[in-house]
Amino acid sequence: MSRPRQLQRWALVPASGLGLALCLLLGGCLDNRARPLLGLNLQLAHTAVNRDPALSSDWLALIGGREGREQVRLVRLSQGAPVPLPGLNRPDARPVAVAVDGWGERLALIRELEGRSELVLYRRSLQSLQLIPIEPAGVPHRLAFSADGRVLAVEVGRGGLSQVDVLELP
């Protein structure tokens, strides 16, 4: 008989009071503040400049540098370690924007080389770089991969207007 009485006592609590109690209990358990990844942030702080981050699954691509020499960097978040990108960074090119796919295999890069902007696709496993033509001609500014890495969206300046081109990648 004690169980029915306990149920009856709960039945006497107004629904709004029960809802308030539930919110207070759950609110105390949830921490909705962002937490910095201290180890990774300290590692990134060793570079004088870090900009244009692109985050995808377990990968962080960014442009970083010292003493005016910027280059694309790739970090595997689960290991907190940089990944080499042989053949991607050129001393005579200035990186503008970067994106990385969810597997860390493909990186898209906008860079300035000899006074012009170009879009290139880097395949990490092949250490290969492929120029992606912008048609009709324009100046690429920003980019983003689709979730599966097969499609690339590129913001392109044409005639003073910003447009978005969506490219299916080979």
Q: Where are the model-predicted features located?
A:
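Sec-dependent bacterial lipoprotein signal peptides
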Residues: 1-29
